[in-house]
Swiss-Prot record:
This protein's GO CC annotations: cytoplasm
Organism, scientific name: Myxococcus xanthus (strain DK1622)
Keywords assigned by UniProt, alphabetized: Cell cycle, Cell division, Chromosome partition, Cytoplasm
SUPFAM superfamilies: Winged helix' DNA-binding domain
Induction: The 3' end of scpA overlaps with the 5' end of scpB, indicating the genes are cotranscribed.
Cell division listed as a keyword: yes
Protein's UniProt name: Segregation and condensation protein B
Entries under NCBIfam families matching the protein: SMC-Scp complex subunit ScpB
Family: Belongs to the ScpB family.
Subcellular location: Cytoplasm
Length: 329
């Protein structure tokens, strides 16, 4: 303490000066000022990460019993829209059981909703068609709009080579089948083709046959049914259906190849009937005259041959008695 003209004064040295208190620590500063922006961000990020890792989305916490009780209160139209929404976001065909586990709606009501949706989203009516494929249900674009969809997406259509189609057909109709059996039918090596089909997930290994060498058994996959839009393997066309389909196509081609009747206003319709009849008579007369001319020429040819045989004075060749010698060639 010092005494000045204005009275006694306390002199407190500045922090850090000799004889004064030391500088404030970071803990002391934080206790007075609070956490800085960076500290607040770190705390928020840690809390957010902890919440995301411990807590699940509220929809997944809903028990299946509550879902069942809620689904019983849904109207028929609401059930249809729920099933439609779930199928729309699904990446693969969903079965009735999978739809039941996702929605809690009774299977009978799901089947009715699928029947209604099949009538709404059908080929030729809607751009989105509901198909029953691979044991489930799936929304797909209208096949008649495929060209425009591919053009927008800029993707090439998936095509199979002739060898791949033949091999895949043998596997589909003869499964489970071994590679030697496939090659015995096709008559060529099929190893590369089978590998290509497996890479495209159209064919899978079903196991091994219990015989010498334990050859691998091949069969079609779920992706095969999805690729060809088949409900199951029983939907494959039979040989009888193939012949009927071939005959139907043949009749369609023959029907399309028939000449069309002349349209009104054409040259055939505007021609003079009397002139047409005269031309037909003239053509018939020309044909008759041509036949008479051909007969006359044939008769003249016969007469000439007879005259030549009568006027022929060439003496016959003398006969030789020597039959043992070689004849001149």
């Amino acid at each position: 303490m010092t005494t000045g003209s204005n009275g006694p004064q306390d002199e407190t040295p500045e922090p850090g000066t000799p004889g004064g208190p030391g500088p404030f620590s970071e803990e002391e500063i934080a206790a007075v000022t609070g956490p800085g922006p960076a500290d607040e961000l770190d705390e928020l990020e840690a809390a957010s990460i902890e919440e995301d890792s411990d807590e699940a989305p509220p929809d997944l916490e809903t028990s299946f019993e509550k879902l069942l009780s809620k689904s019983r209160k849904l109207s028929t139209d609401r059930i249809r829209t729920v099933i439609e929404s779930v199928l729309f976001v699904a990446e693969r065909p969903l079965s009735v059981d999978e739809l039941y586990m996702a929605t809690g709606i009774e299977r009978e009501l799901i089947a009715e909703a699928l029947n209604q949706l099949s009538g709404i989203h059908r080929d030729g009516i809607s751009g989105i068609v509901l198909y029953e494929v691979a044991g489930g249900w799936q929304f797909r674009t209208d096949p008649h709009s495929g060209e425009y969809v591919r053009r927008y997406l800029r993707v090439k259509p998936q095509r199979l080579t002739r060898a791949a189609v033949e091999t895949l057909a043998i596997i589909a109709y003869r499964q489970p089948v071994t590679r030697p059996e496939i090659e015995d039918i096709r008559g060529v090596d099929c190893g590369a083709v089978i590998k290509a089909l497996m890479d495209r997930k159209l064919v899978k290994i079903l196991g091994k046959r219990e015989e010498v060498g334990r050859p691998i058994l091949y069969g079609t996959s779920r992706e095969f049914l999805e690729f060809f839009a088949l409900k199951d393997l029983s939907a494959l066309p039979t040989l009888r259906e193939f012949h009927e389909l071939t005959q139907e196509h043949r009749e369609i081609v023959e029907k399309e190849d028939k000449p069309a009747p002349p349209a009104a206003g054409t040259v055939e319709a505007l021609s003079d009937p009397a002139f047409t009849k005269r031309m037909e008579k003239s053509a018939a007369a020309s044909e008759a005259a041509l036949e008479d001319l051909e007969e006359a020429m044939a008769a003249a040819d016969r007469t000439q041959k007879v005259s030549s045989s009568v006027l022929d004075t060439t003496p016959p060749e003398p006969e030789t008695g020597d039959t043992t010698g070689p004849k001149p060639e």
